Amino acid sequence: MDLPLFLRSIDALTPWLRRITALSLSGADAAALQAAGLEAEAAMFRATGGVNTHKGALFSFSVLLAALGRYLMEGGDVFAHAAALAAELTPPRDTHGTEVARRHQVGGARAEALAGFPTARKAAELLQTHDPLTVLLWLMAHTEDTNLYHRGGAEGAAFVKEQAAAILAAPPEQRVALTQALDDALIECRLSPGGSADLLALLLNSSSTVFPSFDR
């Protein structure tokens, strides 16, 4: 994976995220929203030659955008809508995420959505007073990242959590260098905290309409 590949993926997914939002605003049910999400996933794989660049992010963005549509139409709480919508979706079968959930008893992106995005909401509060790198490290220390479990098992996931927590405990002026060293180690181990990156992206592309305490 490299930056051009990620940019191609983003270009392929952007119109579909708009489509999912529009469907929700029109009152589409969960089945129609999920069908659009699957078409978006297919568009991503076509753009990347079969590489999974944003599958987890697509799920989280789609659920939250669809929940925002319901909130704008019906009122209530965005995150309650997100949790309800996630529960209405047909669970995937035979994916890396479902295998990780079975083997390690962790839920990943689906569990986060079903709970109303509690980790993302806490991270949004932190982003009020901390830079994105610090928030990313906090997410790495607290997120049950199925991508890490898939690639490195429980040991790999624990390693990333421990290292991120250690960097957060270090003097702030050392964090960039320590993070760069951790990045090198993760590349060597073929570990990617993609779930944490997805949640940070969700925050950086959201507004105070979604996260009331978050006003960038």
Give short role names for the model-derived ranges.
Residues T48-L65, G69, C189-N205:
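Conserved phosphate/anionic-ligand binding catalytic regions in large, soluble enzymes, centered on
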Residues S208:
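A compact, surface-exposed functional segment
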Residues A36-E39, A43, S60-V63, A67, ...:
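Generic beta-strand or strand-like secondary-structure segments
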Residues A28-T48:
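Active-site cofactor/substrate anionic-group-binding motifs, chiefly glycine-
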